[in-house]
Amino acid sequence: MTLPDFRLIRLLPLASLVLTACTLPGHKGPGKSPDSPQWRQHQQEVRHLNQYQTRGAFAYISDDQKVYARFFWQQTGQDRYRLLLTNPLGSTELELNAQPGNVQLVDNKGQRYTADDAEEMIGKLTGMPIPLNSLRQWILGLPGDATDYKLDDQYRLSEVNYRQDGKNWKVVYGGYDSKTQPAMPANMELSDGSQRIKLKMDNWIVK
């Protein structure tokens, strides 16, 4: 099914997965300069990752809807990635597979959709305006196209401010998983007005 045939997918309001663990603590100590060599080295290490995957809890909260789910994100190559949203029983509510020039999404009824742009597809199908193209960088702790950002005292991204398609996204990082090398985000919150997107990563596998 192509883009003009999109129907709204209503993910289950999975109240049992409220992200209490995703409350973002304040950062300790002064932030570091974006011009520091430590920050440049950290960015280089992250960008050199060929494959990675993470799973955890997802929440989308707005005046119109509240969605809670589990997520699985896997990148297998340049611009090739897979995103799953599942309910508490482990059933897939949404599966997205993207590669250059082609995006496929399967809903919880097995209906398949295709399009060129994953971000547009997610927005039209779910009603959630997730900045997926930028989130692919932000979830790694990289600023992407944003030039307004701050670092924490460990030379890692702590905040991003980015204007996109009339929206002013603010991204705040609540911590990093130091068990991985390089350290990867452990939880983060995106906000634009009354809209909030929360992600809590259980673990990372990087290569």
Curated annotation (Swiss-Prot):
It comes from the Bacteria. Keywords: Cell outer membrane, Chaperone, Lipoprotein, Membrane, Palmitate, Protein transport, Signal, Transport. One of its GO terms (biological process) is lipoprotein localization to outer membrane. Its main location: membrane. InterPro entries: LolA/LolB/LppX, OM_lipoprot_LolB. Residues 1-21 form the signal peptide. It is found in: Cell outer membrane. A lipid is attached at residue 22 (N-palmitoyl cysteine). It is a lipid-anchor. GO terms for cellular component: cell outer membrane. Monomer. Plays a critical role in the incorporation of lipoproteins in the outer membrane after they are released by the LolA protein. Belongs to the LolB family. This is Outer-membrane lipoprotein LolB.
